[in-house]
């Protein structure tokens, strides 16, 4: 009820917030400030579910947009059981809607960012993925596929650079000035050549592991015969 004196009108004070309505969660933070992490928004609903909204990668001068890569770190109390929902998988490819997830999509978790374990997800209404995690420690990495980082690429180049069958050449630069490189494996005078592209998108790490494995396989002793012709 309002009351009034000669100089002012004063509204009644709002009732104090009910502490029972405060969301109780053992989550401390969703961290994305590290190499190859995917940017996202997140919030906790009234049931304590952590809702994560991936941010689309938009193609220049095109309606196309894509998501499919997620990589973040959960920081929470040890022993916590958390439920998470991932959304924003309404991709657009050549002007048509497409989705990178389904009822067969898995998720990967890791305590150290090196050793990964696959866990199931539930494909729920709204083209979303729902899954649960148990916090053995205070940090847990979550990803769509085992991430392939710039540091992984640098390690590979260092590993193979002195091999006489390898040549690493800079062929251009990215829009931010980073070098674009091509790795030749084999005899430069061979009659046949195969061109394989990797690292086209940061959110497509699976192909990077395949190409790295192919390079290592070809450079092994039993693989050299394929490089001679």
Locate predicted features:
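M14 metallocarboxypeptidase catalytic domain recognition
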Residues: 1-229
């Amino acid at each position: 009820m309002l009351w009034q004196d000669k100089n002012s009108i004063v509204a009644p004070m709002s009732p104090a917030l009910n502490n029972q309505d405060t969301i109780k969660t053992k989550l401390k933070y969703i961290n994305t400030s590290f190499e190859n992490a995917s940017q996202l928004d997140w919030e906790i609903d009234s049931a304590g579910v952590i809702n994560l909204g991936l941010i689309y990668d938009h193609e220049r001068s095109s309606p196309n947009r894509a998501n499919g890569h997620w990589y973040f770190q959960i920081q929470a109390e040890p022993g916590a059981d958390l439920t998470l929902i991932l959304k924003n998988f309404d991709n657009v490819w050549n002007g048509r809607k497409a989705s990178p997830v389904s009822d067969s999509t898995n998720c990967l978790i890791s305590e150290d960012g090196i050793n990964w374990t696959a866990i199931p997800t539930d494909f729920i209404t709204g083209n979303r993925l729902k899954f649960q995690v148990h916090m053995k420690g205070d940090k847990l990495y979550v990803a769509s596929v085992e991430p392939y980082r710039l540091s992984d690429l640098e390690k590979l180049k260092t590993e193979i650079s002195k091999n006489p069958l390898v040549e690493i050449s800079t062929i251009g630069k990215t829009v931010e000035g980073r070098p674009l490189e091509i790795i030749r494996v084999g005899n430069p005078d061979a009659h046949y050549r195969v061109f394989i592209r990797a690292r086209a998108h940061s959110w497509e790490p699976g192909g990077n592991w395949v190409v790295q494995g192919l390079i290592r396989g070809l450079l092994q002793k039993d693989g050299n015969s394929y490089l001679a012709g």
